[in-house]
């Protein structure tokens, strides 16, 4: 089906690329795509295009990559050029998903139907940069995707629609991300169909209660504090897959832990002590309970099941992982 509603799209990672693909495949014209500038990535630190740029280029969509959209920011000339491009590109609505740049009021006012954001949480819980990670880390039973009409606040706009998703006990940020991306793509296409048909989308202000913020994930958070309860550490490991991973330091080497589950404590070993190193998993004492680690990665190596890891990098009961710096 071909649609007439013209959609400018702004987004950067895979989560956003799923939405752009759905919009394009549904037949909505996309006269312009905004995405962040290419960034160095990988072992060679070569410049890499974003997932959104790769999709847009592959499908012949015009792409702009301004470093900022704020005239008062660090790149005023580039921002001015980008804003002029938005003004001169005929369109009806802008869809924004994990773009990574702030949109000032001047930009929000350009599209006739405003700017719609796809956010990976059930707002107002987990406003901010890392909603999927923080939902798993906190032990939430469910999360979801919210469509909102954007305003200048941080994820504070009125809500258009939402989809709820249960968080499974073995979900990681990677697995949950993929389900939420698919739901976000479905929601935005449905909303654009309604917008084209009705001319507007009803929206409900966010509740004042239940607001939490999902701070950006920092590498410094990766270090596991073994004094915490085992269930908390297991959630941290799942939340930090694929980035930055849960890090356990042994004799100065940072070992990444990628899969773990809480189990009953064995004895009264100090937190961080390896209680058992078996093919089924490495048991580590925690502040309460113990953690069975079933997937590990040594520096420069690959993720391996415990059995394969131990074959090449033996661990033994009595060894102790260090506590984080300053602990």
Swiss-Prot record:
InterPro entries reported in the protein's UniProt record: Fmt, Formyl_trans_C, Formyl_trans_C_sf, Formyl_transf_N, Formyl_transf_N_sf, Formyl_transferase-like_C_sf, GART_AS, Met-tRNA-FMT_C
Catalytic activity, as annotated: L-methionyl-tRNA(fMet) + (6R)-10-formyltetrahydrofolate = N-formyl-L-methionyl-tRNA(fMet) + (6S)-5,6,7,8-tetrahydrofolate + H(+)
Enzyme Commission number(s) from the entry: 2.1.2.9
GO cellular component: cytosol
GO MF, one annotated term: methionyl-tRNA formyltransferase activity
Domain of life: Bacteria
Residues annotated as binding (6S)-5,6,7,8-tetrahydrofolate: 121-124
One Pfam short name: Formyl_trans_N
Keywords, ordered alphabetically: Protein biosynthesis, Transferase
NCBIfam families with a match to the protein in the record: fmt
Family, per entry: Belongs to the Fmt family.
Function: Attaches a formyl group to the free amino group of methionyl-tRNA(fMet). The formyl group appears to play a dual role in the initiator identity of N-formylmethionyl-tRNA by promoting its recognition by IF2 and preventing the misappropriation of this tRNA by the elongation apparatus.
Protein name in UniProt: Methionyl-tRNA formyltransferase
Species name: Burkholderia ambifaria (strain ATCC BAA-244 / DSM 16087 / CCUG 44356 / LMG 19182 / AMMD)
Lineage of source species: Bacteria, Pseudomonadati, Pseudomonadota, Betaproteobacteria, Burkholderiales
